[in-house]
């Protein structure tokens, strides 16, 4: 778990899925992104990539090859590498591997940056196509 903190907020981000897990408002003395009940839902604010939503029938075809894809892609279920973590900035990266290419045949680097300034948390997603083919994707969170 990575933590960013200033005089207003304490923010926690998991390396698993680069998921925002907690925003604690110090002035209000309350959790803004609550810890859910894992009996019902064990996520908080998942990052969705390379698909948002379901693909028809759980499969899609690219260049004549059929690929399985679960709802909302796979990023939320993968460990991201934390490449920066300071009191006001956290950067996570997920890159394509042999495993991701079994379901998503593209070379990519997906970076999630969270920056804390005052009472504002800014989240930036950057998708880089590191291959030669056109890459189709969507991002959500």
Give residue spans per PLM region.
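Surface-exposed acidic/polar loop and edge beta-strand patches at domain peripheries
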Residues: 1-126, 130-141
């Amino acid at each position: 778990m990575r933590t960013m903190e200033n005089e207003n907020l304490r923010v926690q981000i998991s390396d698993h899925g680069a998921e925002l897990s907690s925003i604690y408002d110090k002035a209000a003395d309350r959790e803004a992104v609550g810890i859910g009940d894992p009996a019902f839902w064990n996520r908080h604010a998942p990052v969705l990539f390379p698909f948002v939503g379901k693909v028809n029938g759980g499969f899609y075809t690219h260049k004549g090859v059929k690929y399985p894809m679960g709802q909302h892609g796979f990023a939320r279920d993968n460990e991201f590498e934390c490449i920066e973590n300071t009191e006001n900035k956290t950067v996570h990266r997920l890159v394509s591997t042999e495993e991701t290419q079994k379901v998503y045949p593209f070379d990519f680097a997906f970076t999630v940056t969270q920056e804390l300034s005052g009472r504002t948390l800014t989240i930036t997603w950057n998708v880089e196509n590191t291959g030669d083919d056109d890459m189709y994707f969507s991002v959500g969170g």
